[in-house]
């Protein structure tokens, strides 16, 4: 286990990002995707999160934000999300040895024994996913899947909320490469 290394690649605000691929005019706007029957928010853009919209917020309670803040609410298009997920996962598979698709927008990659500059390798995959599929993603690396998930959370938080974590951990965070003091600081 000491030599194990996993990456977790996770699409950012995945359903909203999928919608923005085909509707770039939505970039920079507060956007949510609603559940079946448009009952509640199941995905939120960073702009919508900044308005305080919680995951699972009932549509009838936040509907007024359309008028007051220009909130765009979209009905879910699961066929579209599945297609873009398939494209993303096929690119992500090239990151390491084995892939375990964890959800529609998350994939664990076994990177144990992969040689070379791992951050550069992750950056290349991240850039390909963005360029070829249109989906922004963050990558977390750790010696276990749980720590890779935590590293991904740190990578997303460092990007979305500057100052919450060191800036160099934004987008791609490798917990396995941090020295003890840096690791303790991040986990505090």
Predicted regions and their residues:
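Gly/Gly-Pro- and Ser/Thr-rich, intrinsically disordered tail segments characteristic of DNA damage-repair
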Residues: 1-188
């Amino acid at each position: 286990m000491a030599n194990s290394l996993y990456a977790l690649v996770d699409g950012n605000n995945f359903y909203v990002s999928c919608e923005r691929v085909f509707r770039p005019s939505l970039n920079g706007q507060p956007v949510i995707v609603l559940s079946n029957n448009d009952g509640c928010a199941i995905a939120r853009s960073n702009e919508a999160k900044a308005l305080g919209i919680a995951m699972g917020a009932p549509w009838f309670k936040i509907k007024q934000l359309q008028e007051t803040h220009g909130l765009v609410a979209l009905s879910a298009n699961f066929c579209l999300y599945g297609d873009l997920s398939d494209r993303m996962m096929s690119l992500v598979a090239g990151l390491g040895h084995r892939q375990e698709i964890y959800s529609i927008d998350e994939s664990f990659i076994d990177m144990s024994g992969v040689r070379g500059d791992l951050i550069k390798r992750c950056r290349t995959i991240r850039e390909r996913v963005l360029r070829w599929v249109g989906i922004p993603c963050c990558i977390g690396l750790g010696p276990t899947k749980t720590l890779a998930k935590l590293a991904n959370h740190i990578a997303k938080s460092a990007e979305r909320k500057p100052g919450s974590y060191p800036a160099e951990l934004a987008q791609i965070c490798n917990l396995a490469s941090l020295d003890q003091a840096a690791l303790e600081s991040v986990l505090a």
